[in-house]
């Protein structure tokens, strides 16, 4: 996790948790001169649009006061959704047995994109089976990971 994301996580997660939600993850996407700060929240009985609005208002106040982002940005508060992103080893461990799509920051064994069965977590690695090959992907190399929803 980059130091900017760690700083934002440390600032925003306590606010989200104080409101009774779980901070599922944070993404900060630079898009030219304007950036996007996307905050995913969750709770046991699911997230409604009103929940996102409540959290967004509180986070906006904190961000205005603390001013951790020097450039222009848009704050977006969202539920993780069906194709939920995975940020932590704990989240990967909770979704063992599901199909995942993973993009790496840099190539690993000659590739950056992996789509397959999430087999487990070993120390700091995520274990993914693609076809008949098992890959141990270092968590620090993962740029983006999502569950692939099943519609059975």
Swiss-Prot record:
Its main location: cytoplasm. The keyword Cell inner membrane does not apply. It is found in: Cytoplasm. It holds the Pfam family RimP_N. GO terms for cellular component: cytosol. The keyword Plastid does not apply. GO terms for biological process: ribosomal small subunit assembly; translation. Keywords: Cytoplasm, Ribosome biogenesis. It comes from the Bacteria. Belongs to the RimP family. PANTHER family: RIBOSOME MATURATION FACTOR RIMP. Required for maturation of 30S ribosomal subunits. This is Ribosome maturation factor RimP. It comes from Ectopseudomonas mendocina (strain ymp). The lineage of its organism: Bacteria, Pseudomonadati, Pseudomonadota, Gammaproteobacteria, Pseudomonadales.
């Amino acid at each position: 996790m980059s130091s900017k994301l760690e700083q934002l996580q440390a600032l925003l997660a306590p606010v989200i948790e104080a409101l009774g939600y779980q901070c599922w993850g944070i993404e900060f996407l630079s898009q030219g001169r304007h950036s996007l700060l996307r905050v995913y929240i969750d709770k046991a009985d699911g997230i409604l649009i009103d929940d996102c609005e409540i959290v967004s208002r509180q986070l906006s106040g904190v961000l205005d006061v603390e001013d951790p982002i020097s450039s222009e940005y848009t704050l977006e508060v969202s539920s993780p959704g069906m194709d939920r992103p995975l940020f932590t080893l704990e989240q990967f461990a909770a979704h063992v047995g599901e199909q995942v799509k993973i993009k790496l920051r840099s190539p690993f064994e000659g590739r950056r994109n992996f789509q397959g069965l999430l087999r487990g977590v070993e120390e700091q690695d995520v274990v993914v089976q693609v076809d008949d090959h098992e890959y141990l992907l270092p968590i620090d190399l993962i740029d983006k990971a999502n569950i692939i929803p099943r519609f059975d």
